[in-house]
């Protein structure tokens, strides 16, 4: 109990969410996880970023790699921590909270997430790795309402990338095929 504010201290859970942005030669896509659940007797299907709560015995970077591997099969992806999201309204939708509590088998109140970002080139090998998972590439303009605040996290990731590329333009070339057109470069 905080004496000045007369409110209880937050009992935060910490999670990691991974924004994996890929370029398939034509457009930018985000790697999302298919999610299904039930709320008030109604079945729902939507999507979310690859993410989960962290374990007590792991570092944030380890958690991000573990979560990405468990949910997508991807290994050794270059992930960069880019922002923390801790709005008290992150868990305002009961559907999200109930889904997470069932998945984690634990009571969840407030969640602070550490967002990670990766830029990858989408190729056959990468897609083959995803075949056995509930993961899918979704073009940026086709992304619908996602779980939690994941739309905001993606928006912030795109802003971060644009600023990052201003100072590190060579990072764009990692996304492009060996031979690329001016149109492909402009798309990025």
Positions of predicted regions on the chain:
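Short Pro/Gly-enriched beta-strand edge/turn motifs at strand-loop
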Residues: 1-3, 98
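Active-site segment of metal-dependent pyrophosphate-handling enzymes
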Residues: 14-16, 62-65, 69-124, 164-172
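Short histidine-centered catalytic/ligand-binding loop motif
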Residues: 49-57, 174-175
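N-terminal strand-loop-strand
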Residues: 6-47
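NUDIX/MutT-family hydrolases
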Residues: 111-122, 126-163, 175-187
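Short, His- and charge-rich active-site/binding loops that engage polyanionic ligands
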Residues: 30, 34-40, 44-46, 79, ...
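A eukaryotic nuclear recognition-module signature that targets compact all-alpha binding cores
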Residues: 40-47, 159-171, 182
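Core subunits and conserved enzymes of cellular information-processing
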Residues: 3, 25, 30-32, 57, ...
